[in-house]
């Protein structure tokens, strides 16, 4: 049984993307997340047989992170969890899974593949999307907008976008850009502005920058936002 908690783990945050990787003597498991839209993300997980012999793999997902009072309903290849107190709708779709089921009103169990044989050097790719819409937003419209997107293409476009932005940032003539310690600060500033950006929602009519995750819960600071 492949238990992630017992294996070597690395976690990386790149501009616009999260990566987690787990390794043991038989398998490499890499999962990546990037944004499709301002309301939806794609999650791509790849398991590779690193050994010299076939490996049997059963691939399951379990989760229990939703509100206990959520209203759960099934959709094509997924589940919808609506939180009654504010009508927030979280939709998770497992595009490559065999079986998806709710467990109570706050959990799920997904059978991706059972007893799948993975030959030496071969890979299996799991794909899912997560969408969060707020009160008054059209969930069906958002799901339709991402339904035809190719997950691999989205990750390729994400990489191209951020590589182009970083190249543009570092292409100036400033003497400071010749020193790696300043180049790193510049890239970190870009990553912070990206991470702290918030799209319009509720009483906030325009996108802007949330100044910090620590000690500041909601809202936007205008003197940060004009820079974005």
Give the predicted meaning of each segment.
Residues 218-228:
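Alpha-helical support elements that line or immediately flank enzyme active sites
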Residues 1-16:
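A eukaryote-biased signal for short, well-structured alpha-helical docking elements
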Residues 1, 18-20, 79-82:
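Short polybasic amphipathic segments
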Residues 11, 47-48:
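Generic cytosolic/nucleocytoplasmic N-terminal low-complexity/intrinsically disordered segments
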Residues 28-29, 35-42, 48-218:
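Acidic/polar, glycine-enriched structural segments that form the non-catalytic walls/loops
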Residues 12-37:
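Low-complexity, acidic Ser/Thr/Pro/Gly-rich terminal tails and inter-domain linkers that flank the onset
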